[in-house]
Regions:
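Small/aliphatic-rich secondary-structure junction motif
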Residues: 1-58, 136, 146, 163-177
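Short beta-strand elements of ligand-binding domains
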Residues: 113-114, 141-146
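Glycine-rich, Arg-bearing micro-motifs that act as flexible, cationic patches
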Residues: 109-136, 150-152
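General small-molecule cofactor/ligand-binding pocket signal
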Residues: 30-32, 88-92, 142-144
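Structural alpha-helical scaffold elements that stabilize or flank donor/cofactor-binding regions
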Residues: 22, 100-103, 133
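Structural beta-alpha unit
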Residues: 10-11, 80-110, 148-177
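A short acidic, glycine-rich active-site loop
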Residues: 53-74, 119
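Active-site phosphate/pyrophosphate- and oxyanion-stabilizing loops and adjacent acidic/basic residues
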Residues: 17, 77, 131
Length: 177
């Protein structure tokens, strides 16, 4: 059984714990972290626009890329240590939700933490990326609460029922037709 675990800062410990609890016999565990290319790319562009391309050693985009890579490596190392068993560490760069779906191809299970409003039950507990991943994953998804699950009383009230359509006297199901 191949399990892919999407790791995000702040919620990754719960995802790792979910693998230990719900997939203890997994034959392969892939710890996945995805970095968005946006911030370093913006810094590269701003630097090149202001000072030209001749001073690469001073480009703040390079420093941001290095910081991001080191942070991702530390997160993956901490997750592997918490898992306490053999695993593969995978760092990808791109549109987060699409990279997660691509990494889950061929997996038997994808572990995902809720990334939206985690204070109440309901559809808003998934953010944009989480919703995309849940809707497009090519395998079963284990969707977890990274903290204590909110009480059932936090479910939003149902929308009002639409009024019944008017009955037409000549309709075939009308009792006087």
């Amino acid at each position: 059984m191949r399990v892919v675990v999407w790791l995000v800062e702040g919620t990754w410990p719960a995802c790792v714990d979910a693998v230990r609890t719900h997939a203890p016999r997994a034959t392969e565990v892939v710890l996945l972290h995805v970095s968005e290319p946006g911030v370093p790319g913006l810094a590269h562009g701003a630097f090149a626009g202001l000072l030209g391309r001749g001073h690469a050693e001073r480009d703040p985009g390079n420093r941001l890329e290095d910081l991001g890579a080191r942070s991702a490596a530390r997160l993956l190392d901490a997750a592997a240590e918490r898992l306490g068993r053999a695993c593969t560490r995978q760092e990808r760069t791109g549109r987060t939700e699409r990279e997660v779906v691509a990494a889950a191809e061929g997996a038997d299970l994808l572990v995902v933490a809720r990334d939206g409003d985690r204070a109440r039950l309901g559809p808003h507990s998934l953010g944009r990326a989480g919703r995309f991943v849940v809707d497009h994953a090519p395998c079963p998804v284990l969707l977890i609460w990274p903290e204590a699950t909110p009480a059932v009383t936090t479910i939003p009230p149902p929308p009002p029922h639409p009024p019944d359509p008017p009955h037409h006297p000549h309709h075939p199901h009308h009792p006087h037709s």
